[in-house]
UniProtKB/Swiss-Prot annotation:
It comes from Clostridium beijerinckii (strain ATCC 51743 / NCIMB 8052). It is found in: Cytoplasm. Coiled coil: none annotated. GO terms for cellular component: cytoplasm. It catalyses: cytidine(1402) in 16S rRNA + S-adenosyl-L-methionine = N(4)-methylcytidine(1402) in 16S rRNA + S-adenosyl-L-homocysteine + H(+). Belongs to the methyltransferase superfamily. RsmH family. Its EC number is 2.1.1.199. Its main location: cytoplasm. This is Ribosomal RNA small subunit methyltransferase H. The lineage of its organism: Bacteria, Bacillati, Bacillota, Clostridia, Eubacteriales. The keyword Cytoplasm applies. It comes from the Bacteria. Specifically methylates the N4 position of cytidine in position 1402 (C1402) of 16S rRNA. One of its GO terms (biological process) is rRNA base methylation.
Length: 310
C-alpha cells in the first residue's frame, strides 16, 4: 500500500520555523515527508534536514519523495533519542525542530497496522514494528486496574471502568486478538444511548492503548527539553498535537521553559536565578483554517505550538 499522508498545518509550520536557507532542521516525525519537502525547498545546498522516524514504511516513502534532495540525513529512531542522534551525526546545534504527533493517514488506513477501529486487523498499534510490545500484550496481559487507569487517563473515557471489566471477562474465555473483537467488547460496555451520540465508541479506548503501546506521553517532556537545549539562539521548535492530553503536556512544558522561576509568588523579585530559555510564539496555539478542515477532516483537532530559543 502506498504511504499516503496529508500534512496538517503545512504553511503554518513552514512559517513558524522561520527557516534560514543554510540552517540545520530536524523533522522528528518524518512520515511521508510532506513537511520536510517544503523545509528542503527553503534550504540552500548548505542547509541540512535530519529526518527521524521509527516507522520503516515511513522512511522508505520519505526517501522516495525526497530522492532529488541530497542534503538529507535519514535516521530510523524515535525523536526521544534526539540527543544521541545529533551526537552520532557530530552536530551540536540546530536551527529548528518540527514534531507532528499524529498517527499518519497511512497507518490508520493500512489495516494490518491495527491502529484503526474501522478496519479489522490483529491488535498491534506499534509505530516501530521492531518492538515486541503491542496492543495485544496490553489487552490480554494487563490487570483490570491497569487497563482502567490507561483508558481513563490516556483516553479520557468516562466508561473506562466498565470497558476494562468487560475486557477482563471476555479474555477469560479466549485471548482478544483483533481490532473488531475489541470494538465489539467496547460497544457492549458502553450504554446504547451513549453509543449513538458523539464519536465512534471505540475512539478513546483505541487512542489510550496506542499511547501506552508507544509510550507517547512519557517521552514528550524529555524530548522537548533535549530539543530546546540543542537549538541555536533564535531557533524554533514547532509541535503539532491532535488531542488534549498531548496539547496540555506541550503547553505546560513550553510555559515552564518560558517562565522557569520557582520563587514564591509573594516574592517582590526573582532570587532563584532561573531565566527564561524560550519565547512563546503562539501562546494560544494555531488551529487549522476552516478550508483545511473541509479538505482534510482529520486535521480538525490539530493544534500547532511554537517556541523560539532565547
Amino acid at each position: 500500500m502506498e504511504f499516503k499522508h496529508v500534512s496538517v498545518l503545512l504553511n503554518e509550520c513552514i512559517e513558524a520555523l522561520n527557516i534560514k536557507e543554510n540552517g540545520i532542521y530536524v523533522d522528528g516525525t518524518l512520515g511521508g515527508a510532506g513537511h520536510s519537502s517544503h523545509i528542503l525547498s527553503n534550504l540552500s545546498k548548505d542547509g541540512m534536514l535530519i529526518g527521524i522516524d521509527q516507522d520503516q514504511d515511513a522512511l522508505k516513502a520519505a526517501k522516495e519523495k525526497l530522492k532529488d534532495f541530497e542534503n538529507v540525513k535519514y535516521v530510523h529512531s524515535n525523536f526521544y533519542n534526539i540527543d544521541s542522534i545529533l551526537n552520532d551525526l557530530d552536530i551540536e546545534k540546530v536551527d529548528g525542530i518540527l514534531m507532528d504527533l499524529g498517527v499518519s493517514s497511512y497507518q490508520l488506513d493500512e489495516a494490518s497496522r491495527g491502529f484503526s477501529y474501522m478496519k479489522d486487523a490483529p491488535l498491534d498499534m506499534r509505530m516501530n514494528r521492531e518492538n515486541d510490545f503491542s496492543a495485544y500484550n496490553i489487552v490480554n496481559n494487563y490487570d483490570e486496574d491497569s487497563l482502567y487507569k490507561i483508558i481513563k487517563d490516556y483516553g479520557e473515557e468516562r466508561f473506562a471502568k466498565r470497558i476494562a471489566n468487560f475486557i477482563i471477562n471476555r479474555r477469560i474465555e479466549k485471548p482478544i486478538e483483533t481490532t473488531f473483537e475489541l470494538v465489539d467488547i467496547i460497544k457492549a460496555a458502553i450504554p446504547a444511548k451513549m453509543r449513538r451520540e458523539g464519536p465512534h465508541p471505540a475512539k478513546r479506548t483505541f487512542q489510550a492503548i496506542r499511547i501506552e503501546v508507544n509510550s507517547e506521553l512519557k517521552i514528550l517532556n524529555k524530548t522537548i527539553e533535549d530539543g530546546v537545549n540543542r537549538l541555536n539562539k533564535g531557533g524554533r521548535m514547532a509541535i503539532i498535537t491532535f488531542h488534549s492530553l498531548e496539547d496540555r503536556i506541550v503547553k505546560l512544558k513550553f510555559r515552564e521553559l518560558e517562565n522557569p522561576c520557582t520563587c514564591p509568588k509573594e516574592f517582590p523579585m526573582c532570587i532563584c536565578g532561573k531565566s527564561p530559555l524560550v519565547k512563546n510564539i503562539a501562546k494560544k496555539g494555531i488551529a487549522p483554517t476552516k478550508e483545511e478542515i473541509e479538505e482534510n477532516p482529520r486535521s480538525r483537532s490539530a493544534k500547532l505550538r511554537v517556541i523560539e530559543k532565547l
